[in-house]
Curated annotation (Swiss-Prot):
It comes from Synechocystis sp. (strain ATCC 27184 / PCC 6803 / Kazusa). This is Large ribosomal subunit protein bL33. It comes from the Bacteria. The gene is rpmG. GO terms for cellular component: cytoplasm; ribonucleoprotein complex; ribosome. InterPro entries: Ribosomal_bL33 (IPR001705), Ribosomal_bL33_CS (IPR018264), Ribosomal_bL33_sf (IPR038584), Ribosomal_zn-bd (IPR011332).
């Protein structure tokens, strides 16, 4: 059977918002997570509170392009 075009799920990247603006952090770099999202149910960009290893605390991670 042939597949129907693009599926509803796609892989997205979540990036820490405080890593870019805060020079006083534990280590250099920007923390990123990858996850999947259903574009039919969640049309807006995701914002999740996750642990950032560079800031060493829970911060808001936003979906990137």
């Amino acid at each position: 059977m042939a597949k129907k075009g693009k599926g509803a799920r796609l892989v997205i990247t979540l990036e820490c918002t405080e890593c870019r603006s805060n020079p006083d952090k534990r280590s250099n770099g920007v923390n990123r997570y990858t996850t999947m999202k259903n574009r039919r149910n969640t049309t807006a960009r995701l914002e999740l509170k996750k642990f950032c290893t560079h800031c060493n605390k829970h911060t808001i991670h936003k979906e990137t392009k």
